[in-house]
């Protein structure tokens, strides 16, 4: 017979698990560079929810609000509605296209209404813009970035755009590398957001001992540095992963075996405990294979992954300590940090812009991984919002670096990629308070419902006892 205390703990555990976002990053383009349509997103979201040996990944982080060009809302939105996949929205901030990004956001709210709003767990204004604007980003040809002051103005514009709408309470954040967050010159950005998104890739920390056996320690250290500047704000894990194939980075070897180890040691403690968007479900198709390639399903979109995704009890045993190390003010959100990969573009598929940026689909198509400083970082593989291999500069949708993060509960943890001196990173202050799930439509209402349901279960069982 269970005691009331045990029942309460179980119910709250269930409610907490339901509140945490667990998903992948999704670019706007396919691995071959062509634009994804609604059916493509639906197929990806459906696959992620039904991956073998998992409980399903039902959240999606986007890099852009735009479908191709202009200001038409991205087709990932109706796909998410059809597949009941939560969304961490992304607006591509570099390249001067913010007017169209905001117009697309407003259009999506008007067109899809509450069906859309209830799925939104957060909004990311920009992705690795501060890294690309830094000395290290420039040396690595990571693509076009923006100054922190301009990014702050964009964040304010997005707040104004959603005021009075179904998304009026959605928490707004920014995604960047950890060294961008810890750079005091970027402090204004940390002050302006509700949560900090962390992109971290120990694989690319090529000036350090970065073998797969060192990866977890590097990741955890980066998270702690990001958390230190986050104050009482949430840190969301918006991008991390280990490549299944491709060239080595110092001691880091790309292989299915190592990707599995990274999944077990870094991913499993995060999943269902911290808002996490993994990089990536698929970034290769046919002959279009980026170097390195991070896709866990290989060249074919299938629910059968390249390696076992199940998380054993031993791999999850450190989940509570992992959560504690990355969370800002809430026990639910934890963050881990590691270095970043090459830069990205809003297209979001394998396609590094000529600055070493990737397409948001998560593959690389050019650019190089220049290591600068004692612990230099490479921009993330998702550097382009399109999500597919899209060559060109990272200045606009489909050309810049793309990384985004989201969480089904509206709270999660993130970490920025690791790199030390010479990059422009913003130090977070403890100024604004993270929005609570109850403060916004969508994930907040689901979270409230989850907790309410758990409370009802507790009450009913308590009476029965």
Swiss-Prot record:
Its EC number(s): 3.2.1.39
GPI-anchor amidated glycine: lipidated positions: 442
**A cellular component term, taken from the record's GO annotations:** cell surface
Molecular-function annotations in GO:
glucan endo-1,3-beta-D-glucosidase activity
What the protein does comes down to: Glucanases play a role in cell expansion during growth, in cell-cell fusion during mating, and in spore release during sporulation. This enzyme may be involved in beta-glucan degradation and also function biosynthetically as a transglycosylase.
Signal sequence interval, chain numbering:
1-19
Induction (record text): Expression is under the control of the nsdD transcription factor required for sexual development. Transcript level is the highest at the beginning of asexual development and decreases thereafter to increase again at the late stage.
What are the positions of the active site? 128 (proton donor), 239 (nucleophile)
Residues linked to a glycan: 183, 318
**Which gene carries the instructions for this protein?**
eglC
Superkingdom of the organism of origin: Eukaryota
Residues of the region (Disordered) are: 320-356, 380-440
Specify residue ranges for compositional bias: Low complexity.
320-333, 380-438
Q: Which family does it belong to?
A: Belongs to the glycosyl hydrolase 17 family.
Record-linked InterPro entries:
Beta-glucan_modifiers, Glyco_hydro_17, Glycoside_hydrolase_SF
What name has this protein been given in UniProt? Probable glucan endo-1,3-beta-glucosidase eglC
The GO annotation for biological process reads: cell wall organization; polysaccharide catabolic process
Membrane topology note: Lipid-anchor; GPI-anchor
- Which key words tag this protein in UniProt? Carbohydrate metabolism, Cell membrane, Cell wall, Cell wall biogenesis/degradation, Glycoprotein, GPI-anchor, Hydrolase, Lipoprotein, Membrane, Polysaccharide degradation, Secreted, Signal
Pro-peptide residues, renumbered to this chain, are 443-465
Q: Which organism is it from?
A: Emericella nidulans (strain FGSC A4 / ATCC 38163 / CBS 112.46 / NRRL 194 / M139) (Aspergillus nidulans)
Q: How is it modified after translation?
A: The GPI-anchor is attached to the protein in the endoplasmic reticulum and serves to target the protein to the cell surface. There, the glucosamine-inositol phospholipid moiety is cleaved off and the GPI-modified mannoprotein is covalently attached via its lipidless GPI glycan remnant to the 1,6-beta-glucan of the outer cell wall layer.
Q: Which Pfam families match?
A: Glyco_hydro_17
Give the UniProt subcellular location, in the record's own words: Cell membrane; Secreted, Cell wall; Secreted
Q: Which reaction does it catalyse?
A: Hydrolysis of (1->3)-beta-D-glucosidic linkages in (1->3)-beta-D-glucans
């Amino acid at each position: 017979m269970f005691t009331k205390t045990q029942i309460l703990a179980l119910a709250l555990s269930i409610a907490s698990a339901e509140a945490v976002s667990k998903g992948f990053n999704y670019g706007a383009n396919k691995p071959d560079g062509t634009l994804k349509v609604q059916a493509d997103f639906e197929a990806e979201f459906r696959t992620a929810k039904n991956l073998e040996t998992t409980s399903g990944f039902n959240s999606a982080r986007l890099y852009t609000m735009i479908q191709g060009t202009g200001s038409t809302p991205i087709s990932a939105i109706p796909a998410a509605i059809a597949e009941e996949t939560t969304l961490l929205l992304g607006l591509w901030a570099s390249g001067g296209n913010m007017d169209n990004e905001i117009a697309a956001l407003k259009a999506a709210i008007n067109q899809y209404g509450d069906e859309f709003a209830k799925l939104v767990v957060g909004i990311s204004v920009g992705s690795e813009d501060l890294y690309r604007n830094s000395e290290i980003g420039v040396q690595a040809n990571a693509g076009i970035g923006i100054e922190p002051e301009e990014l702050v103005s964009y964040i304010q514009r997005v707040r104004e755009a959603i005021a009075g709408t179904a998304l009026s309470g959605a928490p707004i954040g920014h995604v960047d590398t950890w060294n961008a967050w810890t750079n005091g010159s970027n402090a204004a950005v940390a002050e302006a957001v509700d949560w900090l998104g962390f992109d971290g890739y120990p694989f690319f920390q090529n000036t350090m001992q970065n073998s797969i056996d060192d990866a977890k320690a590097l990741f955890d250290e980066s998270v702690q540095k990001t958390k230190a500047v986050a104050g009482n704000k949430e840190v969301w894990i918006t991008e991390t992963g280990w490549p299944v194939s491709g060239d080595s980075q110092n001691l880091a070897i790309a292989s299915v075996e190592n990707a599995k180890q990274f999944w077990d040691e870094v991913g499993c403690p995060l999943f269902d405990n911290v808002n996490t968007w993994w990089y990536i479900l698929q970034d290769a198709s046919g002959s279009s294979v980026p170097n390195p390639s991070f896709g866990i399903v290989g060249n074919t979109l299938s629910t059968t992954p390249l390696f076992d995704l199940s998380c054993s009890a031993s791999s999850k045993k450190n989940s509570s300590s992992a959560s504690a190390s990355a969370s800002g003010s809430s026990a639910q959100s934890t963050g881990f940090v590691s270095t970043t990969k090459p830069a990205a573009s809003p297209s979001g598929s394998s396609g590094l812009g000529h600055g070493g940026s990737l397409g948001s689909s998560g593959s690389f198509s050019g650019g190089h991984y220049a290591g600068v400083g004692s612990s230099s970082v490479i921009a993330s593989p998702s550097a382009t919002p399109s999500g597919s291999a899209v060559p060109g500069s990272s200045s606009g949708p489909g050309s810049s670096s793309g990384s985004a993060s989201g969480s089904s509960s509206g709270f999660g943890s993130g970490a920025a990629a690791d790199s030390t001196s010479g990059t422009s990173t913003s130090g977070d202050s403890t100024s604004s308070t993270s929005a609570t799930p109850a403060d916004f439509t969508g994930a907040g209402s689901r979270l409230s419902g989850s907790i309410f349901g758990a409370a009802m279960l507790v009450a009913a069982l308590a009476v029965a006892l």
